[in-house]
């Protein structure tokens, strides 16, 4: 009886330790960028295939996870994989691709790309199941709601860029966000100490660039519609499971 009691106590503390480990991993979900890559490596098709394989591996683990905590642990891992793939693998191929209002090329540096198509195409190529044509053709606020998967987007009016940067640094987690402006869209990359704007720049037809948001002439706007990408658990799950992102359209 005494041995049974000891074994029961050991099993109890082991179980608590396992749960504590998962809880710690759940809360330690910050996305970190040791460096921002601006140079593509290898071929675009090979880069997509490599990370789609990693996505499938994570999806299998997610489907086989038996508890909510275990699933959340995989979601947290997927956040970092997605952020790394989008910012440091997929997007670098697009730097230098020229802007055009009607541009919709699907091949980096060949042809031209409008701001909405830059976002929708890179989201599709990073593994989201989304209609890149339909998403790119919507108003900035509807694009944001489509990506957020709800009406619960952050709308900021009449804020100076420097104040928006300070808001992000103080209140937002590191990661990638969609941002819609008055007549423009792109990505925001929030790191520990900086806010970057990644977009197909219409000014002087510059095309796809990454800029410090505070220094970007194209980032000035009366309104900002912000949707979370890499810290959006529901969106990450859809990415893993290849579920369709429903595009919100103007009625």
Segments predicted by a language model, with ranges:
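Bacterial signal peptide processing site
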Residues: 17-19
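Low-complexity, Gly/Ser/Thr/Pro-rich intrinsically disordered linker/tail segments
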Residues: 195-196, 200-205, 209-251
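N-terminal capping segments
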Residues: 26-136
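...with weaker cross-activation on analogous glycine-rich loops/strands in unrelated enzymes
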Residues: 138-210
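C-terminal motif of bacterial Sec signal peptides marking the signal peptidase cleavage site
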Residues: 12-15
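Sec-dependent signal peptide recognition
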Residues: 2-7
């Amino acid at each position: 009886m005494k041995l049974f009691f000891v074994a029961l106590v050991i099993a109890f503390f082991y179980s608590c330790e396992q749960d504590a480990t998962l809880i710690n991993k759940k809360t330690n979900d910050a996305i970190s960028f040791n460096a921002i890559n601006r140079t593509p490596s290898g071929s675009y098709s090979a880069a997509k295939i490599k990370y789609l394989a990693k996505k499938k591996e994570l999806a299998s683990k997610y489907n086989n996870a038996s508890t909510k905590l275990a699933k959340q642990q995989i979601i947290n891992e997927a956040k970092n994989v997605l952020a790394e793939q989008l910012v440091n693998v997929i997007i670098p191929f697009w730097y230098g691709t020229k802007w055009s209002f009607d541009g919709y090329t699907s091949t980096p540096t060949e042809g031209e790309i409008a701001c909405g198509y830059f976002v929708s195409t890179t989201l599709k190529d990073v593994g989201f199941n989304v209609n890149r044509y339909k998403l790119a053709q919507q108003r900035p606020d509807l694009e944001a709601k489509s990506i957020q998967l709800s009406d619960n987007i952050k709308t900021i009016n009449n804020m100076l860029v420097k104040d928006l940067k300070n808001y992000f640094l103080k209140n937002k987690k590191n990661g990638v966000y969609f941002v819609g402006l008055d007549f423009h869209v792109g990505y925001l990359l929030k790191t520990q100490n900086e806010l970057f704007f990644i977009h197909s720049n219409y000014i002087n037809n510059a095309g796809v660039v990454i800029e410090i948001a505070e220094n970007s002439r194209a980032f000035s706007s009366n309104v900002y519609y912000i949707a979370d990408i890499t810290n959006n658990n529901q969106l990450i799950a859809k990415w893993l499971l290849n579920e369709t992102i429903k595009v919100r359209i103007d009625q």
